[in-house]
Regions:
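NAD(P)+-binding Rossmann beta1-loop-alpha1 motif at the extreme N-terminus of oxidoreductases
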Residues: 1-58
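Rossmann-fold dinucleotide-binding core
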Residues: 3, 95-175
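A generic structural signal for well-ordered alpha-helical segments
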Residues: 16, 42-43, 107-108, 146, ...
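Short, well-ordered alpha-helix to beta-strand connector turns
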Residues: 18, 46, 60, 86, ...
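Rossmann-fold NAD(P) dinucleotide-binding segment
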Residues: 53-114
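Helical "substrate-binding/catalytic lid" subdomain
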Residues: 166-272
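Short, basic/aromatic-enriched C-terminal tail that caps enzymatic domains
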Residues: 269-289
Length: 289
């Protein structure tokens, strides 16, 4: 069973290509504007459509939770009402270790086997074969099940939260660089020095040019900023649990959230300047409102 049929959940189902998967997404009942699209996506993926989380997982031996980070705890509670004894609950959500430990307590009390899973790359290129870290008491048995589904799990020895810790701390840099890029190139473009700044940065690296990277980062933030901001709030919890002040992370949350809430698609807009122009036009329109 799959709980949450956004990008991750739908990609898993497409990658598996199985007809014995049952799926549910809370937007089927909470958002009438999206419900029809969710139903159509599930039909296209050839999965059975559940009516709610509890009934969707009731007969499932394996349950994959792929909701947004801010809904992960609620999803665990909802699944606990229907999970079978000994069923495996794979928590793929981008959550703080302490959040996953709370989720584990709920699933364990309900009789399920909780598995901490961290998805370590964008899921679209490789779908179900995307690299994933797996931790917790049931990790080894869970990995055997994942391998049977042609997935690519890697065991991280340690308790629930260990895999998530690696991802959360990595995200400080990955999502932080995106936010810094937005801040840097917004200022550089407004100041009329984007080419000079990019050239200076290009001279210090050997991979893709910084303007290309900045254009890519902008698209990622407008497309996935809301979800990434939710993940970064969990990163902030992770840092707080480690007694580290997440000053940069706070700024990252603000940038990801702001651009994600623009409702802007940049997939058909090529290049840094056109993408920044679209972003700042949308931001100016918000100010006018």
């Amino acid at each position: 069973a799959v709980i949450g049929f956004g990008e991750a959940g739908s990609c898993l189902c497409q990658g598996w290509g199985r007809s014995d998967v049952r799926a549910f997404d809370i937007k089927q009942i909470d958002d009438t504007n999206i419900a029809a699209d969710k139903t159509r996506q599930m039909q296209d993926a050839r999965v059975s459509i559940g009516d709610d989380a509890a009934s969707t997982v009731r007969e499932a031996d394996m349950i994959f939770s792929t909701v947004t980070a801010d809904q992960a705890h609620a999803a665990a509670r909802a699944v606990a009402a229907g999970i079978g004894q000994g069923a495996y609950f794979f928590d793929l959500n981008s959550c703080a270790p302490s959040t996953k430990q709370k989720n584990a307590a709920i699933i364990t009390e309900a009789g399920g086997h909780y598995v901490d899973v961290a998805v370590m790359a964008t899921i679209t290129p490789k779908y179900h074969q995307t690299a994933m870290l797996v931790a917790g008491e049931h990790a080894e048995a869970a990995i055997a099940l994942m391998l049977a589904l042609d997935m690519k799990p890697v065991h991280v020895p340690g308790p629930v939260g260990r895999a998530s810790t690696i991802k959360m701390i990595r995200s400080v840099l990955v999502k932080g660089i995106e936010a810094l890029t937005a801040e840097c190139f917004s200022a550089a473009t407004i100041a009329g020095v984007a080419d000079e700044v990019a050239a200076s940065l290009d001279a210090s690296q050997t991979k893709d040019g910084w303007k290309d990277q900045a254009a890519y980062n902008m698209e990622r933030m407008t497309t996935h900023g809301i979800r990434r901001a939710a993940e970064m709030r969990e990163v902030a919890i992770t840092l707080a649990d480690l007694n580290i002040a997440g000053r940069m992370t706070a700024g990252t949350i603000a940038w990801q959230d702001q651009l994600g809430n623009l409702g802007l698609s940049l997939l058909d807009t090529e290049g840094l300047e056109p993408r920044l122009s679209a972003i700042h036009t949308a931001l100016d329109a918000q100010k006018g409102d």
